[in-house]
């Protein structure tokens, strides 16, 4: 009887550990439906370095797509990538230098971490869009790698 109880308790702990483990990929069935109303953060790698905090200067690599839940991993048309250019991007976290979805989504990452951000229009470029590349009211998907925190 005690052995059965201990096995059940161990099973619950294992389920809790699995639930706390970040997914390594965004599965099509797990993608949020449109219209998106909140920021989604999915850690594929949790770094082990310094944590990105508001006010810090952070350096990242990123790739950005128009979010399309009908496409693999929700990645529609790619519109930008620091990786493709071979140049990192540095900005002041929480200082309004980037879209709100980035300020909120990068905060809390650890150096060495990789995070997917699915950003609703109101935390992105909203009704104005951007540069003829991002249409008005677009939901965005970014893969972000945190390189450094100063």
Annotated model-derived regions:
Residues 2-150:
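Cross-family detector of peptidyl-prolyl cis-trans isomerase
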């Amino acid at each position: 009887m005690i052995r059965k109880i201990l096995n059940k308790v161990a099973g619950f702990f294992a389920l809790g550990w699995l639930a706390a483990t970040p997914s390594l990929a965004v599965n099509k069935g797990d993608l949020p439906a449109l219209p998106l109303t909140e920021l989604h953060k999915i850690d594929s790698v949790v770094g082990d370095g310094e944590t990105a905090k508001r006010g810090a200067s952070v350096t990242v690599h990123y790739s950005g797509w128009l979010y399309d839940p009908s496409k693999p991993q929700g990645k529609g048309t790619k519109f930008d990538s620091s990786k493709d250019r071979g140049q990192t991007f540095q900005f002041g976290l929480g200082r309004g230098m980037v879209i709100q979805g980035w300020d909120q989504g990068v905060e809390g990452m650890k150096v060495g971490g990789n995070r997917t951000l699915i950003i609703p229009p109101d935390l992105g470029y909203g009704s104005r869009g951007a540069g003829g590349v991002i249409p008005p009211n677009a939901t965005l998907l970014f893969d972000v790698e945190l390189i450094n925190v100063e």
